[in-house]
UniProtKB/Swiss-Prot annotation:
GO terms for molecular function: 4 iron, 4 sulfur cluster binding; lipoate synthase activity; metal ion binding. SMART domains: Elp3. One of its GO terms (cellular component) is cytoplasm. This is Lipoyl synthase. It is an enzyme of class 2 (transferase). Pathway: Protein modification; protein lipoylation via endogenous pathway; protein N(6)-(lipoyl)lysine from octanoyl-[acyl-carrier-protein]: step 2/2. The gene is lipA. The keyword tRNA processing does not apply. CDD domains: Radical_SAM. It comes from the Bacteria. Its cofactor is [4Fe-4S] cluster. Residues 71-287 form the Radical SAM core domain. Its EC number is 2.8.1.8. It is found in: Cytoplasm.
């Protein structure tokens, strides 16, 4: 894969398609999007644990707006399999290029960090690793097993890539029995060619459906960003597609443009529209909906897991 260094917006490795993309204007964020800069001592301690264990977090790599809040509460989402992705999605700030070899010691370091932070719930995600025969599935499983050995009471949520063209990869991850299996659709199907060109919408739907077929007790979850120019009825249809795959939990958040080289924000949706989506989603049968401008897949993941457990218990009581 040919890559270039984007010296204009950052010193990140970029796919040529992204680095050479014409600049687009970045809209001023509305007041409801703004967050406070992180300053707490707990934030610094969390940062120190991550660095000491030589780990990568999606909180930093993706430029999550909630990093200050989450790290101040000792919440962190670990990104395994390196910090270089094999794909170049138009919304994502993670570096693209040729990844390094898999770090065999990483599962133990992640488990050590989880134990040191005393996490009750942890989220494990990764870059896309199309270069690996199993897409990184076995490494996901090793991380899950390592955490179980050192933090038996910690619940584990995985946020996986689509494992496209990786036969039996999904089965490897599901066999490790994460408590929550998350795979994000990211956007409506009409936007895939521009926003998520390396993925296929209905492959992702089928992936989520297959998880439930293999192990019905694992909670399934998916999320999208809005603001790419999608229509409201497209979002409602996407909800129906997720429910047809028996997905339990959906997240909806506002897309925020990382740099001028990324897909522009077409529209900032006001908070009341997000509240409307949450009500509609509950009516469609999701056990839980998290929908707000600053909602992200891993935001409040531990609290959401407790809500999911209670909702399932009530449903079958």
């Amino acid at each position: 894969m040919v890559t270039v260094v984007d010296k204009v917006t950052s010193m990140r490795v970029r796919h040529p398609e992204k680095a050479h993309r014409p600049d687009t204007s970045i809209q001023k964020k509305p007041d409801w999007i703004r967050v406070k800069a992180p300053t707490s001592q707990v934030y610094k301690e969390t940062h120190g644990i991550v660095r000491a264990n030589k780990l990568v977090t999606v909180c930093e790599e993706a430029g999550c707006p909630n990093v200050g809040e989450c790290w101040s509460q000792r919440h962190a989402s670990f990104m395994i399999l390196g910090e270089i992705c094999t794909r170049a999605c138009a919304f994502c700030n993670v570096a693209t290029g040729i990844p390094l070899a898999v770090d065999d010691d990483e599962p133990e370091r992640v488990a050590d960090a989880v134990a040191q932070m005393g996490l009750k719930h942890v989220v494990i995600t990764s870059v896309d690793r199309d270069d690996l025969a199993d897409g990184g599935a076995q490494h996901f499983a090793k991380v899950i097993y390592a955490i179980r050995r050192k933090s038996l009471g910690t619940t584990i949520e995985v946020l996986t890539p689509d494992f496209r063209h990786k036969d039996h990869a999904l089965e490897i991850v599901v066999a490790a029995k994460p408590d929550v299996f998350n795979h994000n659709l990211e956007t409506v199907p009409s936007k895939y060619l521009k926003v998520r060109p390396g993925a296929r919408y209905f492959h992702s739907i089928r992936l989520l459906q297959r998880v439930k077929e293999i192990d019905p007790m694992i909670f399934t979850k998916s999320g999208i960003m809005v603001g790419f120019g999608e229509e409201r009825n497209e979002i409602l249809q996407l909800m129906d597609d997720l429910r047809s795959a028996d997905v339990d939990f959906m997240t909806i958040g506002q897309y925020l443009q990382p740099t001028r080289k990324h897909h522009p924000v077409i529209r900032f949706l006001p908070p009341d529209e997000f509240e409307s989506f949450a009500k509609i989603g509950k009516a469609k049968g999701f056990l839980h909906m998290a929908s707000s401008p600053l909602t992200r897949s891993s935001h409040h993941a531990g609290d959401d897991f407790e809500i999911l457990k209670k909702a399932r218990a009530q449903k079958f009581s």
